[in-house]
Amino acid sequence: MDFLLKQVFVGLPKTVGNKEAVNPMEREWTSAIFKEPAEGPVWVGRTGLAGDGQGDLKHHGGPEKAVFAYSFENYRYWQSELGISEITSGGMGENLVMANVNEESIAIGDTFQIGEAVIQVSQPRQPCWKPARRFKVKNLALLLQKTGLTGWYFRVLKEGYVGIGANINFSGPALSPVDHPKMQSNYSC
C-alpha cells in the first residue's frame, strides 16, 4: 500500500477563550493547535515548517519534534467514538496528514522522503491538554494515550519542499525498530 500526503497544515500561536470565564474549558489560552491548510508547497526546515510555530516551546518544537504527523484514518475513529464531526484533519495540531500509515505501521528511526524533504520518525506525540480544550473533551489526552492514536514526530534529515498529494517513499526502516506501542510506553505523560 502506498503512503500519501493528504494535507499540510501550518499555523502560528493565537489566543482564544474568555479571560472572565468560570468554566476552565472556556478560559483564555494560547496555542498553535489551530493550524490552517497550506496553499502550495511548504518548506520543511530542520526545526519545522515555514509559517508554523508553537505556543509552548518547552514541550513542542525543536529538531526532534520538527514535524508532527497524524494518520488520516484516525479521524474517522475519533468522529465515531466521540460523536464530534468537527474533529477533522488538522484538528490535533499536526503539520502532515498521512494516509495509509498509522501508529502500528511505523517505528522510531523509520525514514521517509516526501517531496524534496527526508524525514525520520523521532518519537510518538505525548498527548497534552490542548486537543481536549479545543474539542471540549476533558479526558481526550488520556483517550489519545490509551488508544495509541497519538501521532508521531519527525526530525528532518534533508530540508526541502513538501506538497499535498506527494507520494511518501519509505526509504529505510529503523535499524533496531521500536514499534509505536513500545514508543508510547517510553514517552507517556
Segments and roles (model prediction):
Residues G109, E159-G165:
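Loop/turn positions that initiate beta-strands
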Residues S85-G93, K136-T150:
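Short, basic/aromatic beta-hairpin or loop at an interaction surface
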Residues M1-I114, V118-K130, S176-C189:
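Electropositive, beta-rich accessory/interaction domains or terminal extensions
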Residues L143-K146, T150-L157, I168-S171:
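Active-site scaffold segments
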Residues P131, V137, L144-Q145, N186-S188:
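Short, intrinsically disordered/low-complexity patches at protein termini
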Residues E36, L157-G160, G172-L175:
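Short, contiguous, pocket-lining structural segments
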Residues E116, G165-A166:
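Residue-level signal for inorganic ion chemistry
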